[in-house]
A protein has these predicted regions:
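Glycine-rich FAD pyrophosphate-binding loop
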Residues: 1-2
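A short acidic, glycine-rich active-site loop
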Residues: 10-14, 157-158
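Helical element adjacent to the flavin cofactor pocket in flavoenzyme catalytic cores
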Residues: 140-181
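Mobile amphipathic helical/loop "lid" adjacent to a hydrophobic cofactor/ligand pocket
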Residues: 5-9, 16-141, 145
């Protein structure tokens, strides 16, 4: 930024103790400092009053006008319903994509376009058109394993202190030059 260099992580950014035990062990063994991180999600639809974040009711209704917006309320209802019903054992078509499943479940356009597709796009750094092509089975398993279908008791997320450069430099310093020839 300007003349100041700012480190940017482009690989993994956050992790938790439940889902990433080997990574945690790797950081501990290599004395890599970690710190708590915030794993939040928000959406603002340009040129509309449609916006929310996932931080409690005040976040969901950060724009109070949405308390009276039927489409917004339907999206919130669909979020609750989808999260409650999203179980791999309920899926009979193991080859179905996320996009086709969402259509089959008759979920609102707002839920699809302003919640689940943007969230998938953000997590996997993919364009929205590609998010719908994701295999449903993979999506459900990932969200279940990472506690993303929970409204309460989600895992605490962490990141590497001073970002990935810290552990990359630490590991490189422990490897002899002969491995890089």
């Amino acid at each position: 930024i300007g003349k100041k260099k700012v480190p940017v992580d482009i690989g993994f950014i956050v992790f938790n103790f439940k889902t990433y035990p080997n990574l945690i062990k790797f950081f501990e063994e290599n004395k890599i400092d970690i710190e708590k991180s915030d794993m939040s999600f928000s959406v603002k639809v340009e040129n509309s009053n449609f916006e929310y974040c996932g931080k409690g009711l005040s976040g969901i209704f950060s724009n109070r006008m949405n308390l009276f917006n039927f489409k917004f309320l339907k999206m919130v209802f669909d979020i609750v319903k989808f999260y409650k019903d999203s179980d791999l054992s309920n899926v009979t078509d193991k080859e179905i994509t996320l996009g086709n499943y969402l259509i089959k479940k008759n979920l609102s356009k707002e839920f699809i376009n302003y919640h689940i597709i943007p969230m998938v796009s953000a997590i996997w750094s993919m364009p929205p058109y590609a998010a719908g092509k994701m295999p449903l089975k993979f999506f459900l398993k990932f969200f279940q394993n990472h506690g993303l279908f929970k409204f309460k008791n989600r895992p605490q997320w962490y990141t590497v202190s001073k970002r990935s450069r810290t552990y990359v430099e630490s590991i490189i310093s422990k490897i002899s030059g002969q491995h890089f020839k």
